[in-house]
């Protein structure tokens, strides 16, 4: 009775297997994510009519945010020194000014409408009746900005006076200038020509002008602050006596308020003035602490001002409304913005850039801008075995594996019948590229991010440990699948704190603090020796273990090749650890006079070397010089860059090069992988460009030359490998370098680049190979193993990993391994956080995204069905043949 039903069961099972097929498809971009950041915001404007925020950050960004959720709508790069923006809500234009240019931006789409070159960059932008003017003080020229609804016009005008500033009141414009030691105010007509009588101000000749804005003039004389209103320009009014510092802000409303904060007797005091009948009237005086940020809101209903101030954990609105700020370490408040209209009532920015938006007493949204200060991030290895793979492995290790497999397929069939639309392959096959990312920040926080596309909020956890340490270093201490450990150190001038965390949940496993500043920290990779990895600090030639116990360091001290490198500005030393935990200097190298160390790089200690040589077309082999003790050292000497490759065990120099005409030494970047060193710099010799130098070390200059490996690892190794070197010109400015990494090292190691064009790119190893042959015109290459040499490497579209995205401020690129040899994970940080994956040698161990799995399964099922249908016919034919024969 059951036999006629088995084809139906087989069909359902086959469909189930199709939906849960364990062959991974290369779905490019599925795991990619980007966190768009701003950094610490300097100035902010709230468009209450359209519910938008416009911000200028210290990282050099102008941005438009959605006021309802904080999402970035657009961003544009501006000069980092830009601290203020001017927004005209009527014409929808934004104006920013730096030392060289004035920019007019379209607020709707962020497109630059106009860029105006400034003469000396010492001028100032003033808001006047019907627009803005940019004035260079003590010159007779200014730029009038006429902002219309859909376009802007800039007109350079001459002025008959040596103007100091522009003011406006009652739809009239005025110019302030100085003549014969007197400050004079002169009215102007609509063409900015002198109009009407002038007014001599009651301002001393040696007075310091503090504010000349709109309709007020505030100045100081002999430690006293005075105010003048344009409508009564001949009258100076005493505002504040005895002050040291001065801060000013304007509170908009039907009745403008003027907030002045001074440091009186080392105590901050804020005064609030309004103009009544052309006179300054003091309506509020508040003594507060340095840690308080004070603001006011103009109440339209009763024409009063409500006092608002923020401390580390609270925002307090007068008279008794209190809002709690989620601030773990009670960080100081950097900025407080208050608003009387719109959905947002207050915005608080902490000193690490964290951005809080409040509506009445509710926290509406939060931006984790501390991520913009990421430093030395780490990618945890992807899960070594997915849950589906583990179940299969358990079946293979079982004596009843066949029954277990049928039982598993039967359960999958039941799940499919219950939930046919919700059952997908992801329910039985975890995403092979889902991992966690640990990001320390220079502000003292640690973040954990998830690459899981189902994780809407990428941040799994965040913990604050210290406030703004001077330096941060971090390491992946243990990358075991069950309990990965992450270590980091925060250091100040007179102390440091060392932590070990559980990378899964951020819990603190151990903590140590010392009341001195360490000279250097070292990470010891002991995986190959079946010992736990160790971290130690060095201070005054003494070793301080931060992990493990002294017995492990005693074992390290007994190993002949356990030599560590200590660098100062002018000296490089190699030392071993003695039994009494002191530095035993084995060798020392002094740089030339005037030469200073700027950086050093080493190979990734977890790097797997799959190939010990490079196979040529004729099947001969160039053997790589794979000395694990090599490190690269970069130094500067005047305008020259000096590059060394040294052996840390012997102190010998195996490669040295010098480059002239370096523009900026802080833009020298390098990576070291296997026997391959790649570094970049900007030079004006022979012409200004970005150069990439590729160096590859081999055991000999010819193929099939190989030396004894014992000679390489010896402490008396004086062998100098042969170096192939090529220089390339790159058509972009490079901001950082990285290298891809895979589990077995079989896949090509390509170079990752951060670009000043706000992109993340990758150059194939074949293009950077120093063994590319130099050919004469029309000459054919003898060895097809290498691409003929071309001095310029263009940036092609297929090299860009960030697609059409703008990834701002890329300063670090980190790569991580996956379960698939073809694929590496790529993380870029600096300002934005961008995560993607790439296959340097193509995804050869997974199906293409264009592969038609459905067609394959249907074809296979069709063949099987045809076999089942024709089987009775074949049997009948065989029976007839036997019967009639």
Swiss-Prot record:
Among Pfam families, the record links this protein to:
Beta-prop_EMC1_N, EMC1_C
Q: Which residues lie on this side of the membrane: Cytoplasmic?
A: 875-885
Membrane topology according to the record:
Single-pass type I membrane protein
Keywords of this protein's UniProt record, alphabetized? Endoplasmic reticulum, Glycoprotein, Membrane, Signal, Transmembrane, Transmembrane helix
Instruction: Name the source's superkingdom.
Output: Eukaryota
An annotated GO cellular component of this protein is:
EMC complex
Q: What does the function comment of this entry state?
A: Part of the endoplasmic reticulum membrane protein complex (EMC) that enables the energy-independent insertion into endoplasmic reticulum membranes of newly synthesized membrane proteins. Preferentially accommodates proteins with transmembrane domains that are weakly hydrophobic or contain destabilizing features such as charged and aromatic residues. Involved in the cotranslational insertion of multi-pass membrane proteins in which stop-transfer membrane-anchor sequences become ER membrane spanning helices.
The entry's protein name is ER membrane protein complex subunit 1
Organism for this UniProt entry: Schizosaccharomyces pombe (strain 972 / ATCC 24843)
């Amino acid at each position: 009775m059951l036999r006629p039903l088995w084809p139906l069961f087989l069909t359902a099972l086959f469909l189930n297997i199709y939906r849960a097929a364990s062959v991974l498809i290369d779905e490019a971009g599925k795991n990619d994510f980007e966190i768009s950041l701003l950094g610490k915001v300097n100035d902010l404007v709230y468009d209450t009519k359209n519910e938008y925020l416009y911000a200028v950050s210290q990282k050099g960004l102008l941005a438009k945010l959605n006021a309802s959720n904080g999402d970035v709508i657009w961003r544009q790069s501006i000069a980092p020194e830009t601290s203020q923006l001017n927004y005209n809500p009527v014409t929808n234009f934004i104006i920013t000014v730096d030392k060289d240019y004035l920019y007019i931006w379209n607020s709707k789409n962020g497109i630059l409408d106009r860029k105006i070159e400034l003469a000396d960059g010492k001028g100032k932008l003033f808001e006047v009746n019907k627009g803005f003017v940019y004035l260079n003080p003590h010159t007779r020229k200014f730029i009038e900005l006429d902002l219309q609804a859909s376009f802007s016009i800039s007109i350079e005008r001459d002025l008959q006076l040596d103007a100091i500033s522009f003011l406006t009141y009652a739809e009239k414009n005025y110019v302030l200038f100085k003549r014969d030691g007197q400050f004079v105010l002169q009215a102007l007509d609509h063409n900015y020509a002198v109009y009407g009588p002038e007014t001599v101000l009651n301002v001393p000749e040696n007075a310091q002008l503090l504010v000349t804005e709109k309709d007020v003039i505030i100045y100081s004389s002999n430690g006293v602050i005075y105010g003048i209103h344009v409508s009564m320009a001949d009258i100076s009014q005493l505002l504040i006596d005895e002050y040291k510092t001065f801060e000013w802000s304007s509170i908009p409303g039907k009745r403008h308020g003027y907030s002045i904060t001074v440091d009186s007797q080392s105590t901050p005091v804020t005064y609030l003035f309004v103009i009544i009948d052309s006179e300054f009237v003091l309506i509020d005086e508040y003594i507060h602490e340095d840690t308080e940020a004070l603001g006011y809101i103009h109440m339209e209903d009763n024409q009063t001002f409500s006092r608002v101030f923020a401390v580390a954990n609270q925002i307090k609105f007068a008279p008794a409304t209190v809002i709690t700020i989620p601030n773990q370490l009670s960080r100081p408040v950097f900025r407080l913005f208050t608003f009387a209209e719109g959905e947002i009532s207050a915005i608080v920015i902490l000193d690490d850039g964290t951005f809080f938006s409040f509506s009445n007493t509710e926290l509406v949204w939060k931006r984790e801008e501390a991520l913009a200060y990421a430093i030395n991030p780490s990618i945890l290895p992807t899960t070594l075995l997915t849950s589906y793979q583990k179940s299969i492995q358990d079946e293979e290790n079982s004596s009843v594996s066949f029954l277990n497999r049928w039982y598993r397929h039967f359960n999958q069939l039941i799940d499919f019948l219950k939930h046919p639309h919700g059952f997908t392959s992801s329910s039985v096959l975890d995403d092979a590229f889902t991992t966690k990312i640990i990001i320390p920040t220079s502000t003292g926080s640690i973040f954990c991010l998830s690459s899981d596309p189902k994780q809407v909020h990428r941040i799994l956890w965040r913990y604050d440990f210290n406030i703004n340490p001077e330096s941060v270093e971090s390491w992946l201490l243990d990358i075991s699948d069950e309990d990965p450990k992450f270590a980091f150190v925060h250091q100040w001038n007179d102390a440091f704190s060392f932590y070990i965390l559980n990378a899964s949940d951020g819990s603190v496993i151990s903590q140590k603090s010392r009341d001195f500043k360490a000279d250097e920290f070292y990470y010891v990779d002991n995986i190959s020796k079946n010992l736990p990895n160790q971290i130690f600090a060095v201070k005054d030639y003494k070793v301080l273990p931060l992990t493990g116990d002294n017995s492990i360091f005693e074992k390290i001290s007994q190993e002949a090749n356990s030599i560590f490198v200590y660098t100062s500005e002018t000296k490089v030393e190699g030392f071993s650890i003695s039994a009494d935990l002191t530095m035993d200097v084995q060798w020392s190298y002094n740089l030339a006079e005037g030469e200073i160390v700027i950086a050093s790089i080493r190979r990734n200690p977890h790097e797997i070397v799959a190939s010990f040589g490079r196979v040529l077309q004729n099947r001969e082999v160039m053997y790589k010089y794979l000395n694990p003790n090599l490190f690269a050292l970069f130094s500067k000497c005047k305008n020259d860059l000096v590059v060394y490759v040294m052996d840390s065990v012997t102190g010998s120099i195996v490669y040295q090069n010098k480059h002239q005409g370096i523009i900026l030494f802080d833009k020298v970047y390098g990576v070291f992988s296997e026997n391959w060193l790649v570094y970049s710099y900007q030079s004006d010799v022979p012409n200004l460009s970005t150069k990439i130098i590729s160096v590859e070390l081999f055991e000999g200059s010819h193929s099939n030359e190989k030396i004894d490996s014992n000679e390489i690892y010896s402490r008396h190794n004086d062998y100098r490998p042969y170096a192939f070197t090529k220089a390339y010109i790159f058509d972009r400015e490079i901001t950082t370098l990285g290298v891809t990494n895979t589990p077995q090292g079989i896949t090509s190691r390509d170079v990752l680049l951060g670009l000043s064009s706000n992109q993340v790119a990758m150059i194939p190893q074949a293009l950077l190979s120093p063994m590319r042959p130099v050919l004469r015109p029309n000459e054919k290459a003898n060895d097809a193993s290498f691409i003929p040499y071309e001095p310029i490497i263009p940036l092609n579209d297929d090299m860009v990993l960030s697609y059409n995205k703008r990834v701002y401020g890329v300063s670090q690129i980190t790569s991580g391994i996956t379960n698939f040899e073809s694929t590496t994970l790529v993380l870029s940080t600096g300002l934005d956080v961008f995560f993607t994956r790439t296959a340097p040698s193509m995804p050869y161990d997974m199906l293409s995204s264009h592969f038609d799995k459905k067609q394959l399964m249907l074809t296979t099922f069709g063949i099987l069905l045809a076999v089942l249908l024709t089987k009775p016919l074949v049997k009948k034919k065989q029976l007839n043949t036997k019967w009639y024969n």
